[in-house]
């Protein structure tokens, strides 16, 4: 028997759906999500939590002309299913497949690309003001989670939208979580709002009862004069109201009928309005309901993308977290900072072991960097653990608040290089380039997980900014000997060879070693150098390579522009190097989603491609 979902492909198909059929459809969508995402991998919990919310939005608004912006965008699966992309879910987040985030080049229904948090209100406000200036008529809807609302950019946008009274609809999807449990004053404030629902319901009932008689109306009028003076004490929604944004809620984000009623009316409200919906992350799937963080993002059931060697011990994140705990036992001034990512960055155990020395600031990378700077200025040794893609949000603070003052802040940059399935917005391929241009910044990269403890210890002891970059997952080559001693600006000759030297940093060193094994079978034996320091480079070793007549190949999991290879090339040019040189990395383009192995192969950074590049030197 054909399901209801099979007959629905576009927003117009939902318009005449009865309430009972909509309930049936919500169950079918959940089943589809569980079955499909379990096969391909992807964001599950967040999408299970917004099924009814998405259906109600699509029934109440006309997204042929109305525009919607999904904050972060990982919760847009239901919207994608019902905008003609259901069949694409078999290739979700795969190379050349359906994106896990909104993409303007994927569908006319995706009005703005997202991937990072807290951008939706700003983007929606920009669209609304463009609409007004052009004299057009449509509604702009921004959907933002309670976690993303803690981001400073979202609050800046709220301040602006309320000041100008621009007409737009903001949906607060409050599931009481971001990826991990939310923290901070705004999170407590939203809890207060949820608890205030009883008060709001009572207030409505009183007004309805009193308003039925003339005496009651007169009493309401007199009460309102008193109400204004005490309103801020008893109605927590005044936070939004004082910013000039009308607040409605909280309402049940799984009650389609209630949401339809509210959404149909807000289109007529002049000025901005925020509708507070309360949802349950992972709803309809018991495992995800119990552990929403665990099922936030899940791997494919037949996961073959794990290019790291399963025999290798720990992931880089785990190795970092364990090392920091050990160092903190000896160094009492060491503190750890995260921006809403304690689990992903490996700090969960540190938070349990040293709760008073652990600081989760919420989705606030700018604040996290300057918080670390303030701590360092007052004698602490802060370590900020952050994904490469998210550190770029604190770019100015790294320069202005850390590097100019030459403060001893350690940046533990996780997910450096290609991360795979999340695509352009999450690849960590730019940190070397923008950090390299900052005076006083040192950049290092461990060649294996075993090297993290000594490198982290060295970074914390150095009395200036240090960035340690390392990839997602585990090692590809196990049992590499960790450096016994780290010497500032010095590289390591890992394997001697002839004629050509491969200089690689981080995980790319492991690719270089595998490429050497391939080349040995063809009679070529390259020298392998581990660029432990990306900044500064080892000028003495480069001068020796010049004197010994080596050709040079550099490999990095970063864009070429501003990267390690360019730094090496500049110095070789300065010393009149006249050998052959080739730079491997990513060109001036954004790297799409896909299996990590496929992406390395596509961009010439897998061991086979590296060996083929070297063969061309000899042909």
Swiss-Prot record:
Reactions catalysed according to its record: D-glyceraldehyde 3-phosphate + pyruvate + H(+) = 1-deoxy-D-xylulose 5-phosphate + CO2
Organism: Clostridium botulinum (strain Alaska E43 / Type E3)
Known EC number: 2.2.1.7
Protein's recorded name: 1-deoxy-D-xylulose-5-phosphate synthase
Residue span of region Disordered: 289-310
SMART domains: Transket_pyr (SM00861)
Family of the protein in this entry: Belongs to the transketolase family. DXPS subfamily.
Function noted in UniProt: Catalyzes the acyloin condensation reaction between C atoms 2 and 3 of pyruvate and glyceraldehyde 3-phosphate to yield 1-deoxy-D-xylulose-5-phosphate (DXP).
The record's free-text note on cofactor binding: Binds 1 Mg(2+) ion per subunit.
Gene3D superfamilies: 3.40.50.920, 3.40.50.970
Pathway involvement of the protein, from the record: Metabolic intermediate biosynthesis; 1-deoxy-D-xylulose 5-phosphate biosynthesis; 1-deoxy-D-xylulose 5-phosphate from D-glyceraldehyde 3-phosphate and pyruvate: step 1/1
GO molecular function: 1-deoxy-D-xylulose-5-phosphate synthase activity; magnesium ion binding; thiamine pyrophosphate binding
Pfam family, one: Transket_pyr
Assembly and binders: Homodimer.
């Amino acid at each position: 028997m054909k399901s209801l979902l099979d007959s629905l492909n576009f927003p117009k198909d939902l318009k005449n759906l009865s309430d009972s059929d909509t309930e049936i459809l919500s169950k079918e969508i959940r089943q589809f999500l569980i079955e499909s995402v379990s096969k391909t991998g992807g964001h599950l919990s967040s999408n299970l939590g917004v099924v009814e919310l998405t259906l109600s939005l699509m029934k109440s608004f006309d997204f042929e002309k109305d525009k919607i912006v999904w904050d972060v965008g990982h919760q847009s699966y239901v919207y994608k299913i019902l905008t003609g992309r259901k069949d694409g879910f078999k290739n979700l987040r795969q190379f050349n497949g359906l994106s896990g985030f909104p993409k303007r080049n994927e569908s006319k229904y995706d009005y703005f690309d997202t991937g990072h948090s807290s951008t939706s209100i700003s983007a929606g406000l920009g669209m609304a003001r463009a609409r007004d200036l052009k004299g057009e008529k449509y509604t702009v809807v921004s959907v933002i989670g309670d976690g993303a609302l803690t981001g400073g950019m979202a609050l800046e946008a709220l301040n602006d939208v309320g000041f100008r009274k621009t007409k737009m609809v903001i949906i607060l999807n409050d599931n009481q979580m971001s990826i991990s449990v939310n923290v901070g004053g705004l999170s407590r404030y939203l809890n207060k709002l949820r608890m205030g629902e009883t008060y709001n319901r009572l207030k409505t009932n009183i007004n309805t009862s009193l308003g039925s008689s003339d005496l009651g109306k007169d009493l309401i009028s007199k009460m309102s004069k008193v109400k204004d003076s005490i309103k801020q004490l008893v109605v927590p929604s005044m936070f939004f109201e004082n910013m000039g944004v009308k607040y409605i809620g909280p309402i049940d984000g799984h009650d389609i009928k209630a949401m339809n009623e509210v959404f149909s009316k807000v289109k007529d409200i002049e000025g901005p309005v925020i509708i507070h919906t309360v949802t349950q992350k992972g709803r309809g799937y018991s495992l995800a309901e119990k552990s929403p963080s665990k099922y936030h993002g899940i791997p494919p059931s037949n996961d073959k993308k794990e290019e790291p060697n399963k025999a290798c011990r720990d992931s880089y994140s785990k190795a970092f977290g364990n090392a920091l705990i050990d160092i903190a036992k000896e160094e009492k001034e060491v503190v750890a900072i995260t921006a809403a990512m304690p689990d992903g960055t490996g700090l969960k155990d540190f938070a349990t072991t040293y709760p008073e020395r652990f600081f989760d600031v919420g989705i606030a990378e700018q604040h996290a960097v300057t918080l670390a700077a303030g701590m360092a200025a007052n004698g602490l040794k802060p370590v900020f653990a952050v994904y490469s893609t998210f550190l770029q949000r604190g770019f100015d603070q790294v320069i202005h608040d850390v590097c100019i003052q030459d403060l001893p802040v350690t940046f533990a940059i996780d997910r450096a290089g290609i991360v795979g399935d999340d695509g352009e917005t999450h690849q960590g391929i730019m940190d070397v380039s923008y950090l390299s241009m900052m005076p006083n910044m040192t950049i290092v990269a461990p060649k294996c997980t075993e090297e993290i403890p000594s490198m982290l210890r060295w970074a914390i002891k150095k009395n200036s900014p240090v960035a340690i970059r390392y990839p997602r997952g585990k090692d590809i080559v196990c049992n590499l000997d960790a450096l016994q001693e780290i010497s500032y600006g010095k590289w390591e000759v890992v394997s001697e060879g002839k004629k050509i030297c491969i200089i690689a940093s981080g995980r790319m060193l492991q690719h270089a070693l595998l490429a050497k094994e391939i080349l040995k079978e063809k009679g070529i034996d390259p020298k392998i150098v581990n660029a432990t320091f990306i900044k500064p480079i080892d000028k003495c070793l480069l001068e020796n390579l010049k004197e010994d007549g080596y050709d040079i190949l550099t490999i990095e999991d970063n864009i070429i522009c501003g990267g390690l290879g360019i730094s090496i090339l500049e110095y070789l040019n300065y010393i009149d190097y006249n050998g052959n040189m080739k730079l491997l990395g990513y060109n001036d383009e954004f790297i799409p989603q896909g299996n990590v192995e496929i992406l390395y192969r596509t961009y010439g950074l897998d061991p086979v491609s590296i060996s083929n590049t070297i063969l061309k030197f000899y042909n």
